[in-house]
Every structure is written in structure tokens, then in C-alpha cells.
């Protein structure tokens, strides 16, 4: 596993790990004291700077809840390249993402800056074939037929 430190708005490093070169890389927002607005700004920047972002409990290689695991499995099955944030690493991000989306639960999936939903919505869209079509409509490459 290769880790690369990249500066983040709040001055801390952004930890980037490549899980599989063609599938995903993950980032973890490091724990630092930050104001609510700073947290929201960092979340907004991450959501807008990446095509597909998953805020989850744990990491794609080690999900810490069943709901996060389901969304990771769906994204991996579709072969979608995505960025993930482990909200368990930073309480401010964990609470900030709920305020940002006005959605009370985690995981949360964003595509091209748009909030898609959590586990139930992603699973439902995947099972109906709508998720694959949604990614294609947004210009996100999908490798597998669903």
C-alpha cells in the first residue's frame, strides 16, 4: 500500500491510499481542531473535487459497519473509481457530513457533487439498474454491467 500526504485546507495532511490502481483511492481527514464552518468547507471541497466520494465508517478494505460494507461492495462490483473518507477518524467530519447533506446516517455517497443517498438508496438503485445508468449519465466510468 502506498500513502501520499497532500495538504488540506485546515493545514493537516490528506492521507491518500491506493487500494487497487483502477478501482479506488481513499483519503482520511486527519484529526485537527476545526470550526464547524471549516469542517463544512473541507467536506465541500472534497465532494466537489472528486467525481465519486463515499463518506463511510471504516475503509473500503476494512468497513466498520454493514451499511458501509454494502455500498463499498456495490461500487467495487461496478468498478467505479471513488474516494472514501473514514468518518470514524474525525468526529468533526462525522458530524459535519450529516449537517452538510442534512441526512442523519452514514454512509453517504456523492457523485459529481450531488448527494445520492445512503446504503438503502444505493442498494435499491443498484438492484434496479438505475445506479449504473446514473453513473453513466454523470460521465462516471462503470466497468461492470449491473
PLM regions with names:
Residues 142-146:
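Ubiquitin/ubiquitin-like proteostasis machinery centered on ERAD and p97/Cdc48
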Residues 112-141:
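Non-catalytic, surface beta->alpha helical segment in thiol-disulfide oxidoreductase systems
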Residues 29-44:
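Flexible, polar/low-complexity N-terminal or interdomain linker segments that lie immediately upstream
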Residues 44-78:
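Local sequence-structure signature of Cys/Sec-based thiol-disulfide redox active-site neighborhoods
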Residues 1-2, 6-33:
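Short, Lys/Arg-enriched N-terminal segments with co-localized hydrophobic residues
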Residues 99-105:
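Thiol/disulfide oxidoreductase modules built on the thioredoxin-like
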Residues 80-94:
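Thiol-based oxidoreductase modules, predominantly thioredoxin-like and allied folds used
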Amino acid at each position: 500500500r502506498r500513502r501520499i500526504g497532500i495538504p488540506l485546507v485546515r493545514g493537516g495532511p490528506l492521507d491518500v491510499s491506493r487500494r487497487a490502481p483502477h478501482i479506488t483511492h481513499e483519503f482520511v481527514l486527519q484529526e485537527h481542531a476545526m470550526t464547524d464552518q471549516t469542517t463544512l468547507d473541507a467536506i465541500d471541497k472534497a465532494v466537489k473535487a472528486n467525481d465519486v466520494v463515499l463518506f463511510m465508517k471504516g475503509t473500503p478494505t476494512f468497513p466498520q459497519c454493514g451499511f458501509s460494507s454494502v455500498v463499498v461492495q456495490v461500487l467495487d462490483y461496478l468498478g467505479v473509481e471513488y474516494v472514501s473518507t473514514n468518518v470514524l477518524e474525525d468526529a468533526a467530519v462525522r458530524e459535519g457530513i450529516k449537517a452538510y447533506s442534512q441526512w442523519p446516517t452514514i454512509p453517504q455517497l456523492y457523485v459529481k457533487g450531488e448527494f445520492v443517498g445512503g446504503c438503502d438508496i444505493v442498494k435499491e438503485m443498484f438492484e434496479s439498474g438505475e445506479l449504473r445508468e446514473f453513473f453513466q449519465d454523470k460521465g462516471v466510468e462503470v466497468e461492470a454491467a449491473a
